[in-house]
């Protein structure tokens, strides 16, 4: 058990990023995540909204409970009570630690925007935090506390995104766009301030660190101004495109349903 938890350091060498072990583990995890989200989403689709949100409430307790345990344990393992400074929920994927509870327990526009936010970024964050987690899988063995807990929290984010879509909880109304933008902007600003003060690399606003963000970092020449602004801008574009495509699909469905049926 000491080896799994990394107490005293890991004796095993990391299998490596994009190794068979890495890909097998995250693919199995994502397959179970997607299957369970679709099954539960279909089961709850016709249930009252209150019942649908109970599933999100359970997911919120699970993801926050796991993360809280991880923070406390890592402070103990690293013999550093300030280790939590490097474990704040200020990455794209860990933002879900806050937005999933907002979606589960919130009311009104903030609830709607939080549901939209989890749908839009939950699965993306899950994929980036598993398949794209080059930093983690290059540093720790696949079946280790660091990677297993990270995999589980990312899987819960992905589960919530798929479940929200399948169960019909999301609205993706155009009026929610400014609130969704505001949620993202608040987290990005907080992450950048933390990056400067700690210092650290929350939201990968300082550098790519072996993730797909390295592409943007290279294209901007690592500019301390244009790189974070480009990353932030791409997030906003992604949100806008997601809403745009969804509303186009909705409009087409409405048009088709309202069109007269010839030969009836």
Residue ranges, per PLM feature:
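Alpha-helical transmembrane segments and their immediate interhelical/interface regions
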Residues: 68-86, 138-169
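Aromatic-anchored segments of alpha-helical transmembrane domains
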Residues: 63-72, 122-133, 184-193
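Membrane-interface transmembrane-helix boundary segments in multi-pass integral membrane proteins
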Residues: 11-30, 185-186, 196-239
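Alpha-helical transmembrane segments in multipass membrane proteins, preferentially the mid-helix core
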Residues: 35-39, 99-103, 156-175
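Membrane-interface capping segments at transmembrane-helix boundaries
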Residues: 39-47, 243-258
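Early transmembrane hairpin module of multi-pass membrane proteins
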Residues: 4-98
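Membrane-proximal helix-loop-helix units in multi-pass membrane proteins
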Residues: 102-160
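Membrane-interface helix-boundary motifs at transmembrane edges
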Residues: 43-56, 105-114, 167-178
